[in-house]
Amino acid sequence: MAEAEESPGDPGTASPRPLFAGLSDISISQDIPVEGEITIPMRSRIREFDSSTLNESVRNTIMRDLKAVGKKFMHVLYPRKSNTLLRDWDLWGPLILCVTLALMLQRDSADSEKDGGPQFAEVFVIVWFGAVTITLNSKLLGGNISFFQSLCVLGYCILPLTVAMLICRLVLLADPGPVNFMVRLFVVIVMFAWSIVASTAFLADSQPPNRRALAVYPVFLFYFVISWMILTFTPQ
Amino acid sequence: MAAVDDLQFEEFGNAATSLTANPDATTVNIEDPGETPKHQPGSPRGSGREEDDELLGNDDSDKTELLAGQKKSSPFWTFEYYQTFFDVDTYQVFDRIKGSLLPIPGKNFVRLYIRSNPDLYGPFWICATLVFAIAISGNLSNFLIHLGEKTYHYVPEFRKVSIAATIIYAYAWLVPLALWGFLMWRNSKVMNIVSYSFLEIVCVYGYSLFIYIPTAILWIIPQKAVRWILVMIALGISGSLLTMTFWPAVREDNRRVALATIVTIVLLHMLLSVGCLAYFFDAPEMDHLPTTTATPNQTVAAAKSS
C-alpha cells in the first residue's frame, strides 16, 4: 500500500493517509469564475465587410488600393521603424515603380545600336530577379521575413531612385556639360543613400545580428547597379 | 491502493536507454552527435575525408569529422539543405576574404579557413560584385580615354554586363567542376590523394577571385604599364593561393601530372584576367588615332573650298 510521507494541508500528522485522500474535501469557492462564453465578437462584422467589397463600385476598389500604395510611398519617403510595409505588403507599388523606371531607362528602339543602354526587358529582369535573389539570400542566411514581404520592401524602396530618374530626365533637357553631370551625380547619390537607409530600416531587424552585414550588402549592390543605370542614361 | 512506481515519470533524457529499447531509432542529442541516416544524397565527400585529416594533422579533426557527418542530413529537395551552405557569420566571411588576400606559404586555405564549412555566399556574391566591377570600370575607363574626342558619343554598353556575367560565372563553376572530376579520377588511381569536396573547390575559386575586384577598379587608370603590373600582382596572389591549396592534393601523384595540373590551374586564371582586361578595357593608345583622322578631313575640306 502506498504511504504518503506528507499530505497537502496536513503537515505533521502522525497517522499515514493514502495519497489524494483529501481531494474530495476540496471545494471550489464561488468567487473564482470558471465559466464563460467562447464567441468571436468580430465575426459578424467580418462577414458584412466581405460582401460589401464585392458590391462596391470599381472606383472604390481602385481608390482603396491606390491609397494603400500611397501610404506605403509615404513610409518609404520618411523611413521610421514601422512595420506597415511588412504587415500589409502588396506588390502593386513595386510593379508601378519598376515599369516607370524601365520605361524611362530604355533606349530608343529605332536607334538600336549594339552597345547602348538597357532595353525595357533588361531593366525589368534586373529589378525583379535582383529582388528575388536578395530575398532568397536573406532567407538562406536565416532571416525570418517572408518572401513577398521582402520583395515588397525592396520594390518600394526603389521609389527614391525613380524620383532621381525623373529629376535627371528634366536636368538633361538643359545644356549638357560638367555642371549638368555634377547635378545629376549629386541627386543620384542622395537618392541612393535614401534607398539604402529606407530598406535597411525595414529589413535589418529580420536578420540574426551576426549576419546583418551579410544580408545588407546585396541590397547595397542592387541599388548601386540601379543608380549606375540611372546616372549613365544618355538620351539618343 | 495505487502503487507509487506506477506514477513515476519515465525518463526520456538518456539516449542510450532508448536506443537499447529501439535500436533503429534516430535520436537527436544536443551534446553528442546522434545517429544520422546513412542514406544521404550524394554529397561528394568521398573516401578522402579520413586521409586528409590524418595527413594534415588537424587537431580538431574529430570534431570536423563528426560535424561534417551531421550537417547535410536534410534531403536535397528541402530548403534546409541549401541553408547549410549559408551557415556563415559576418566575421567568418571577412576572415576568409583576408585569408585569400594574404596567402601564407604552408597554410592551406581550405584547412585553415573553410574547415568543412564551405559556403556559397562568398563565391556567389564575390562573382556578382566582380561582374559589375568589371563592366562599370570598363565603361568608365573607356569614357575617360575617349573624353576629349569630338566623334565620341558615350554609350553605357549595357550588353557587356551580361557577357561579363556569363564569363565569370562559367569560370567560377565549370573550372571547379572539371578540377573536381579530375581529382576524383586520380583519386581512384592513386589511393593517397587528398581530395576536396566539390563545394570546397568552388569556395576556394570564389574567394580567390576577390583580389580582382580592386584590380578591376584600378584598371581604370589608362596606363598600360600600370595595368600589366596590376595583372601580375593579382595573378601572383590568387595563383599562389590556388597553388598552395591544390599542391597537397596532387603531390602524391606522378610528378608530371602534378605539375601539369598546377600549371593548368594558373594558366586558366591568367587567361581569365588577361581576357577581361583585353575585352572590357580599351587600350590607352587609342586616343592618338582620331586626331590623325581629323586632319585629312580638314585638308580635304580646305582643298574643296579653294
From Swiss-Prot, chain A:
Keywords: Acetylation, Golgi apparatus, Membrane, Phosphoprotein, Transmembrane, Transmembrane helix. It comes from the Eukaryota. Residues 106-115, 168-184, 234-236 are lumenal. The modification N-acetylalanine is found at residue 2. It is a multi-pass membrane protein. GO terms for biological process: endoplasmic reticulum to Golgi vesicle-mediated transport; intestinal epithelial cell development. GO terms for molecular function: identical protein binding. One of its GO terms (cellular component) is Golgi membrane. Pfam families: Yip1 (PF04893). It is found in: Golgi apparatus membrane. The modification Phosphoserine is found at residue 7. Residues 2-84, 137-146, 206-212 are cytoplasmic. The chain crosses the membrane at residues 85-105, 116-136, 147-167, 185-205, 213-233. Belongs to the YIP1 family. Predominantly interacts with YIPF1 or YIPF2, but may also form a ternary complex with YIPF1 and YIPF2. This interaction may stabilize YIPF1 and YIPF2. May be required for stable YIPF1 and YIPF2 protein expression. This is Protein YIPF6.
